[in-house]
């Protein structure tokens, strides 16, 4: 029943989102007329080579209207973004519910492990669809935006993706990409699934062995302070794997859609670092260990 209810709510939200998109276009069409008037007024002023009281008053009115139009369009877009966030949240809840139902349904045969190529594609899609933080003027980026860590009392929710420090088969420790199953306030420990094993490899880990992944991309053009900076030590997901390794930031993103360029620690190279490789904001987190000398 819960899945049916979620489907119904998602359908409602999609209808509301469609209406908001139509409103955005209508608002934009209305504002275009005013913007054309502003441009024409400036052209007349240049032709006459003077700023008369008439033009000054006219421009003030036109710009006031343009500002109000832009704010109205911005408000509609923010409402649309809220709808998208709610839809994504419901889809995630539905995925988790289906996963739990599958785990406890003995009448169905066990699922086959996901093909590696499919998993890598899903990880890329997750990075691409990570929402960009768009704050109002004066707003500071929140925790889990880009390089900003979670607050000290933050508890990751079931379904959240994290970097988890686990013991490998050989006895060494490594950071893996994992999904939170649950958190116990009594023991202060997480249960997480190795993302590469689809729930077959479950780990119970203390909070200090868990690093929540970013929930928003930071915009380099408006919030550069929310990004890791050049030569900063991080843990980054090595391309085409599900493991995090130590790396130095080579180049931070310059535009919202850009990835980090990082140098992974690699003793097979003379300087101890790999050539630059691209890693999405979604899969770069702080490394608390010191740099290797």
UniProtKB/Swiss-Prot annotation:
Does this entry carry the keyword Cytoplasm? no
Domain called SGF29 C-terminal: residue spans: 152-293
A Pfam family annotated for this UniProt entry: SGF29_Tudor
| Gene Ontology cellular-component annotations | ATAC complex; nucleus; SAGA complex; SAGA-type complex
- Region named Histone H3K4me3 N-terminus binding: 194-196, 240-243
A single Gene Ontology MF term assigned here is: histone H3K36me3 reader activity
Cited InterPro entries: SGF29, SGF29_tudor-like_dom, Tudor_SGF29_rpt1, Tudor_SGF29_rpt2
Name of this chain's protein: SAGA-associated factor 29
Which species is listed as the source? Rattus norvegicus (Rat)
